[in-house]
Amino acid sequence: MAVKWIAHIFNSRVIGISIDEQSRGTVELGEHTITADWVIAGDGADSAIRKGLGIAFDGMTYPERFLVISTTQDLTELIPDLAGVNNISDAEEWLVLLRTPRHWRALFPVDGTADAALLTSEAAVQARMQRVAPLPVGYPISHVTLYNVHQRVASQFRLGHVLFVGDAAHINNPLGGMGMNSGIHDAVAAADALASALDGDVSALETYAQTRRSTALDFVQAATHRNWEQLQERDETVRLEREARIRATAADPVAAREYLMTSTMLAARPTDRGSDVS
């Protein structure tokens, strides 16, 4: 397959799409319009292409919002044995601490109806971080983000010559880090399916749509929601039973490998022509 040309158009927002009789898509990008035989829509959770084609995006919104605080303070200086990613289950307030290249990031669940200005104020942010680990001089805060959290999947991942990938196709809570990774899997599988279609195997497109949607529903949505349920569990008996299961899994090489294959998404990685391995 020869690529005739590639063009990058930056600082443009997708406004909409129209489909002609030959199934070609014309994508509107503000000052630009592009007509193509095939379209891979990766324009995010608010996908103008998905909405323009009338594809449903069903699911649910969590009752709480997530508050993310980024600091340049090295948390390993304050908390011994801290890992790069830490899911902290607590009967009063769960949280996530994770290392990024330039920051430590703390994620907290907060009241979905509380005033956003109060939640993100300097005093409130410092108070939350001080509960994580006391720091008398205060935390250097790089940025604060407050957002709603959803679990949603498009009713179809393909409409004619349009394929959907990433957040345009499915969104989930960030617990487990599966959102971006599954979106990358989508892109790999969609590119492979499109290459097959251009070589004459159009059935690869439907295989892509069905397998990636099933993966989003049965694997990503299920795993991330389970992570949320486990972190916010308050029943001490249930919490202790889960800890015992985790320790038993870690002590069993076969069970540990199976667990890691799932949690790292290797068990759901795309293979040739959009299919998945189990």
Identify the role of each PLM range.
Residues 2-15:
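A conserved beta-strand/loop element that lines the FAD pocket in flavoprotein oxidoreductases
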Residues 12-15, 24-26, 38, 42-145, ...:
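Conserved FAD-binding catalytic core of PHBH/FMO-like flavoproteins
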Residues 18-25, 158:
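A short, glycine/Asx- and small/polar-enriched loop/turn
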Residues 19-22, 50, 173-174:
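Short N-terminal helix/helix-N-cap motif within the alpha/beta-hydrolase-1
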Residues 29-38, 42, 159:
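Core beta-strand elements of the Rossmann-like FAD/NAD(P) dinucleotide-binding domain
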Residues 41, 141, 147-221:
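Conserved mid-domain beta->alpha element of the FAD-binding
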Residues 123-130, 140, 144, 152-163, ...:
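Conserved flavin/dinucleotide-binding core of flavoenzymes
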Residues 193-278:
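C-terminal helical "tail/cap" subdomain of flavin- and related membrane-associated enzymes
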